[in-house]
Every structure is written in C-alpha cells, then in structure tokens.
A protein has these predicted regions:
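Metal-cofactor-dependent catalytic cores
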Residues: 1-187
C-alpha cells in the first residue's frame, strides 16, 4: 500500500494501441485519450466494458479498464529473468518510468503530458494469455507477499477523466486521493 509521497519525476516511456482485440499493442508516436472512453481507435475503448471475457459476463458494466499502464521497471525485471518483452507487448497503452504504479492507491490521478488525466481503478488481473504469449511469463507477473497473498505485477487499469494526446517523453504528475487510501484491487 502507498506510504510516502508522490514521485518527483515520472515520464511516459512509450505509448501503444491496437484497433483489434489482440494481446499485444503496437507502439505509436502518440495516442489520443478520450474522456470517459479510453484510447481513440483502441479495441478496449468504450463507456461499457470492452474486454471480451467481461463482455460475456455482463456487457452493460462500466468500463473501468479504459487504459492499461505498466511501469518500465517491470520490463527491466523481466529482462533479468530472461524475458525480453518490448513496450506494448503485454497489452499496455502507456509505459511509465519513475512511478511505482502498484503502490499507488485507488483513485490516484495521473496527468499524462499537458492535458490528459486518468484515474486508477485497479490492478490488471494477469491471465493465461500472458502464458500463451511467452511460456513461463505468467509466473513472472504473479507472486506472493510475506503473508502468502497473491501479488499482481502486470500493471494497473484506469479511466480517462480528461482527454488529450499523450506521447513518449511526456511528464507524469501524480495526484493522490484524499485519505484514507484504498489499496488497488483486481478489476
């Protein structure tokens, strides 16, 4: 859980999108975030849930997974474990640098660049598609803490509050919610 202050410097390392329901997303020079929708022309953009597994359960539920963010730190950890995974390959729209996304509380707002603002809704739930993408990778993005509780390391999900264009190199400003903080849970 979050303990401390927001980072002094965080940046967007990469941006990606895909119009198809594919596991990986294609790197872009910039992506346009649309308020209440997600990434323009991305398969997961929409007011209601767009992830196929969620649509099968209830297609009318709100889309709390409009945008997927992963820290570049995960990519480096994967390299140390023998997995070279390019930005966007795990399905993330935004790769960040310099902010521990998993330690932030639910409701944290991230200003991406000059205009766009997203609000963290929860943790990405790593699924079998990660293992299908690369054998052994699922075990790298799941772990256990000291108490034995499951730890998800495959990024966080967010909704878009304010639209705008986001590019690699854009600064990220972190705005914490009013305490008490709530731990990010699977969405």
């Amino acid at each position: 859980m979050f303990e401390g202050k927001a980072p002094d410097l965080a940046v967007v390392a990469a941006v990606a999108s895909s119009p198809k329901h594919e596991f990986s997303k294609n790197l872009q020079t910039g992506i346009r975030l649309l308020a209440g929708i997600g990434v323009e022309a991305d398969a997961h953009a929409g007011v209601t849930v767009q992830h196929r597994s969620r649509v099968r359960v209830d297609p009318t539920q709100p889309n709390l997974r409009q945008i997927h963010l992963i820290g570049a730190e995960l990519h480096r950890q994967l390299v140390l474990s023998g997995f070279t995974v390019p930005h966007g390959a795990l399905g993330e729209n935004v790769t960040t640098e310099g902010v521990d996304l998993h330690a932030l509380p639910t409701g944290t707002r991230l200003r991406l660049g000059t205009d766009a603002v997203v609000e963290l809704t929860g943790l990405r739930n790593p699924c079998s598609q990660i293992e299908e993408f690369r054998s052994g990778l699922l075990a790298q993005v799941l772990g256990r803490d000291e108490s034995g509780a499951l730890v998800r390391k495959a990024g966080v999900m967010a909704i878009v509050l304010v639209g705008g264009v986001v590019r690699a190199g854009d600064l990220i400003a972190v705005e914490l919610p009013i305490p008490p903080y709530r731990r990010l849970e699977r969405v």
